[in-house]
């Protein structure tokens, strides 16, 4: 995990969020422009969205350095993020939307709570299966190591 108190890390996280949001927003704008019959503008938005995605990946690589990230760490980050979404973020947003009478937002948030929980459970399941596979492989490797050691001992005797 990185130092979340560092201003540079906070700036990278904000830039990552902004570039990611711009990517999706511009894809959505392209869809709207295309539906309105403006193919040229749609293509400009799509091209820019592609660039925003590359910017987001650049920030992600600094935040989650590939050489330090293992599948285990990736799953941990994903579980933490999805769990935060369905236990804290979306329930708070839902409460505020209800207070303001934004029924459509409440319905959307309810769907996101369910999906975020499903995502967290999916990632947990993958992590648990990986742990079981690793444990099984460790037992096989231990058995092989003992066999090889016995063979070496027999040769040395």
Regions found by a protein language model. Name each.
Residues 1-157:
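Non-heme di-metal
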